[in-house]
């Protein structure tokens, strides 16, 4: 089995995460998309073979894809102590009162979904059934604005523009450069 070697930016995040978990039962890692957050999760599982991890994620495809990528990074390493469950499955188990796997560490990938009204109930159920588990969240963008909020802003902007045009004024919309 090959040892997972982290890139320097992930090693720093991993070291900080381990330090946080020594002092607290909850921690999070926020890094941009594509920078290797799943590799940090796998490293935690590899470095803690006596602990059971439950990874909550948005869909099976992402997990399967990440496991395939992991086989390129650490050939021969398949984390046997890492189970995967979608947020939707956790929600369904909460509704039915079904059994939740016991774990030492709950990992919430894309943890900004934990606050969603229905998926959040599933997360809470997992936590309640593993009261001593440490909880670790991973996300690229932990703050999300609801579609309602974005639509309201767009609607208000367009209404203001139409009102100004109605009175013969020219409307310019500010644009932010993405470069």
Where do the language-model regions lie?
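Post-DEXD/H (motif II) to motif III coupling segment of the RecA-like Helicase ATP-binding lobe
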Residues: 113-173
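Structural motif
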Residues: 28, 54-56, 84-86, 105-107
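Conserved Walker A/P-loop ATP-binding site and its immediately adjacent core
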Residues: 33-34, 38-71
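Inter-Walker segment of RecA-like/P-loop motor cores
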Residues: 58-102
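Conserved pre-motif I regulatory segment
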Residues: 1-28
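Short, conserved loop/helix-junction motifs that constitute active-site signature segments
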Residues: 48, 96-105, 124-132
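Loop/turn-to-beta-strand initiation segments
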Residues: 52-53, 79-82, 103-105, 131-136
